[in-house]
C-alpha cells in the first residue's frame, strides 16, 4: 500500500526526517518497503503557456511551439507530445534547467529546428504520471511561475500492513496510529452526520445471502454532473498510484484511501427495480470494470438488480455495464460489509483483485460502513451536485465473534455492540465501541517485566483510542476500528 506523507499530515503532524518517520510506522507492526521523495531537484522549470503551434517540417509527429514563460518574448520549444493544444499550460524546462535524476536540459536543435527547452510530463519531474503525455496544468496559474511553487513536496511510502491490522489500510487509520506512537495530536476526518436520515431499505435492497452480506447501505443521488475531478482530488489519487477517471469514481477511491471504506457507485439507469445480493448462478458471467469477462459459480456473491442481472462481484469489482460514465445523471452509492472469507475465495478463484477486495479480505470495520457513505455523499454533492435520498439500510452488522462472547467486565452489562439499534431520522449513528477486554495490571507487570508503569500503560491505551470502564480501571472498551484487540495479551 502506498501512503502520502503530505496527506497523512492532514491528520497528524510529526516533524521528523523521512527515515525517522518511516521508523515510527514500523512500530505499528507494518513493514516499510521503501520511500521516495517527490518535488525536489527541480531547477529553472516554470509554468509555460502554449501560444502557437505548427508542424515540424522534418517530422510527422513533432510540433514547434511558441511558449509564454513569463518573459518579454516567448521561447520556441519543440515537442513530440500529442496531448498539447494552444492555450494549454504545461511545465517548461528552460535552458540549463535541472530535473530529478541529474538530468540537465539545454537548448539545441531537434531535426534542424531550434528548441530552447523541453515541455515536461509529470514523470519527467519525478512525479507520478497524471495523464498520458505532457502534464496539463490548471488554467489559473500564471506563466513564469516556478514549478516548485506548483508541486507539493511529498514523500511516498510503500508499506506492507500485517493481515491482523486492517485498520491501518487508510491514511486516516495510519495517522491515528502514528499520533499514538509519537504522542502528537490527532485530527480526525470531519464527517457531519447530523442531517443524515436512515431508513429501512424495504424492497429497495434485498439480502438473499445474509451470512455472506449481512449489512448493506445504499443512497440514491439524482441529478449529478459527471465531470473531471478538481486538481486537489486528482493529486491525492495520483500520489497513491491511481488514475483519475471522473469525479464520482474518484470520490469513491478517495474515501477508500482516506477512511479505508470500500465503496461502489452504480449508474441508477442501469439498475432495474432495486438491489439484490445473492450467490451467482452456476456458469453466470459478468464483464467487470477491468474489461474482462468472468464465469462465476454458486459460491460467488454478486450484487444484482431485481431483474436478475448481475451488477458487480460482491466485494471484488463492479461490472462494466452498470458503471458510471459521462452520460450518467443518477447514481446508487453502495457501502456494505462482505464476509472476508467469501471475498477472499472469489478473488483467488477468479485471479481478480482490487483495492476493495484487499480490504474486505482482511476484515473491514462495520462501523466504517456508514461513515464512508456519509463522507462520500457529502463530497459528491459538493463536486457533482444532485439531491441525495435517505440512506437505505438493509440487514444489520454482525458483532466481532470474539467480542460477542466476552463476559461482563466489572460493573458493566456485558459487551457493548457497535451495532446498537439504528434510529430513524436525523443524526442516526452507531455506538463507537466493539466490546470489552480486561487487562489485569499484574498481567501487564508479568509481560513487561515491570518496565511499564500502570499510569504509562493507561496513557498508551488511551492514546490508541481505548477507554477505561468507570469504576473498573482494568477493563477497557475497544474502539470500533480495532478488530484485532480481543484478549488481554493483545493489549
Where are these regions (language model features)?
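Phosphate-backbone binding interfaces of nucleic-acid-interacting proteins
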Residues: 1-195, 199, 307, 332, ...
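Conserved phosphate/anionic-ligand binding catalytic regions in large, soluble enzymes, centered on
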Residues: 2-3, 7, 81-89, 163-182, ...
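Noncatalytic alpha-helical scaffolds and linker/capping helices
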Residues: 38, 393, 430-491
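Conserved catalytic alpha/beta cores of large enzymes that bind or transform nucleotide phosphates
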Residues: 123, 226, 294, 300-397, ...
